[in-house]
């Protein structure tokens, strides 16, 4: 098993993540990672350790990538409404990209794979990402002063995950403009602390 302070090469990490995406945890193998990376199975085992450890490393890599891409998108916007709308568009685009699955691959998106296998960790990371954004929105007066940033962040994350998990109904999830409008029309009203 690799030591905790030893880093895994980016190409091997990418191959492990791609293998997990393609086959899912049940069919994941170190041999498949080795084939994807163009290295020996021994090299994979020396770098990633056991099959279970390799799966954990690949899941962590995918979760980190998801949270980092959301953070990048949030940093492009100043208002909470725009940040949530941009994150919703990102998740909808991710959903569209996940629709194309290899013939022998698993029939689920990366986000569903992460929620099923490391959902608690992914939710915690995502909520932690949103807390300072909600706090900043509170300081700007976009949301009510009595709103708890942690609870509001959890609400935002749960809302965002629904764009991946629920089928499109009234809003066209394939249209970034429609998704932005849908989120912008409704997101902040619930966080002002006012009653309707």
Map each language-model feature to its residues.
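Amphipathic alpha-helical packing segments from all-alpha helical-bundle domains
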Residues: 67, 113-142, 150-157
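Hydrophobic/aromatic residues within well-ordered alpha-helical segments
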Residues: 58, 62, 66, 84-91, ...
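Hydrophobic alpha-helical connector segments
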Residues: 57, 71-100, 153-156
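Basic, helix-initiating cap at the start of DNA-binding domains
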Residues: 1-36, 52-56, 61
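C-terminal peripheral helix-coil segments that are non-catalytic and often amphipathic
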Residues: 2, 93, 127-140, 159, ...
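Short hydrophobic clusters on alpha-helical segments that form packing/core surfaces
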Residues: 12-20, 66, 70, 91
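Short hydrophobic/aromatic patch on the recognition helix
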Residues: 37-48
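Amphipathic alpha-helical segments used for helix-helix packing
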Residues: 95-117
């Amino acid at each position: 098993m690799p030591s905790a302070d030893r880093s895994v090469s980016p190409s091997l990490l990418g191959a492990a993540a791609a293998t997990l995406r393609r086959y899912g945890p049940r069919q994941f193998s170190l041999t498949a990672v080795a084939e994807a990376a163009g290295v020996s199975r021994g090299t994979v085992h020396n770098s990633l350790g056991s099959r279970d450890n390799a799966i954990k490393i690949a899941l962590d890599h995918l979760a980190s990538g998801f949270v980092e891409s959301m953070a990048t998108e949030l940093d492009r916007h100043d208002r909470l409404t725009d940040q949530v709308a941009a994150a919703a568009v990102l998740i909808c685009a991710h959903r569209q990209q996940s629709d194309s699955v290899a013939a022998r691959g698993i029939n689920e998106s990366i986000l569903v794979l992460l929620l099923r296998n490391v959902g608690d960790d992914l939710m915690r990371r995502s909520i932690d990402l949103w807390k300072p954004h909600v706090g900043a929105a509170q300081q700007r007066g976009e949301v009510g002063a009595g709103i708890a940033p942690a609870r509001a962040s959890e609400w935002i994350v749960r809302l965002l995950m629904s764009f991946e998990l629920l089928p499109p109904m009234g809003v066209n999830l394939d249209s970034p403009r429609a998704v932005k409008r849908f989120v912008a029309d409704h997101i902040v009203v619930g966080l002002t602390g006012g009653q309707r």
